[in-house]
Amino acid sequence: RQRQMCIRDRYNAADERKITVHHSREVINMDEHPGIAVKTKKDASIVVATKLLRDKECDALVSSGSTGAAVAAALFGLGRIRGIERPAIATPIPSLTGTTVVLDSGAKVDAKPEHMVQSAIMGSVYAELMLKIKNPRVGLLNIGEEETKGNEQALATYPLLKAEEHINFVGNVEGRDINKGTVDVVVCDGFVGNVVLKFAEGLASAIMKLMKEAILNGGFLAKLGGLLIKPAMKGLAKRLDPAEYGGALLLGVKAPFIICHGSSKAKAIKNAIGVAIDFAERDVVEHIAGNIVKSRKGNEEI
């Protein structure tokens, strides 16, 4: 009751009707096994929230807790879209041409070639509906552009992506292509994708800090130059700030589900809610389901 009042005290009376508080008595900690915790802690906040989404008492869910628990709750509580064997987390990363979608960025560390194809289809729908990119280009993350490069997973995935008629597959891409914007959608397994995501975030933060240090330690002319480029620096910092993108979409489950960093501040949560609204209003789940059906029919005909 006290927490409920604290939340509502931050809003005026006109806004109070927009807020409904649902109580839960349990929480899933970061060090717990996600699957076991979701099954045993029926009153955990993420489990309660997922039930509300399943029962259509809300249109989308935003979580900034344990990623593993969020994925497990979505799988057990919502279920997968028919034809999707492995949901994927789709994360937008800034590039020279706009935004590149990377998936999977951490839903599951391993993936079969068939799962990668499903990710490519889901990522294409995301890029087309959420980012308004027509006929998005899809690339398979690899150690070289040649079709013969890569490990067993990459070698087995390439021909499947090449044969998939419902995506615009352009071939293998390397890590540097993500920020160059060579393609719009980059497909990889969750282990590699999560490493890429964390590296990109760390690199962006390091670059901004190094630039600030260079200006502060560079003498009068450097400081003068820093003042002149301050507006541009602010714009760059905003573009590289993960909080501006809100959260990542968990694609492949039956309702809009957004996953944020556990360290997300107010701005990130606000933007994640905006992403969730777009996710629901653009019927991304329904479009993914439709494209998966088309893909399966095409493969059956072949």
Residue spans of the language-model regions?
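Short glycine/serine/threonine-rich phosphate/pyrophosphate-binding segments
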Residues: 42-56, 60-74, 85-90, 112-113, ...
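Short, small-residue-biased leader/transition segments that mark boundaries at the very start
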Residues: 2-7
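Glycine-rich phosphate/diphosphate-binding loop of Rossmann-like nucleotide-binding domains
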Residues: 109-175, 184, 189, 201
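Glycine-rich phosphate/nucleotide-binding loop
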Residues: 75-88, 94-102, 182-186, 190-301
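Phosphate/nucleotide-donor binding subsite
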Residues: 15-58
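Metallocofactor- and cofactor-centric catalytic cores in central/energy metabolism, strongly enriched
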Residues: 8-10, 20-35, 173, 240, ...
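A short helix-to-beta-strand connector/capping loop
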Residues: 14-20, 165-167, 253-254
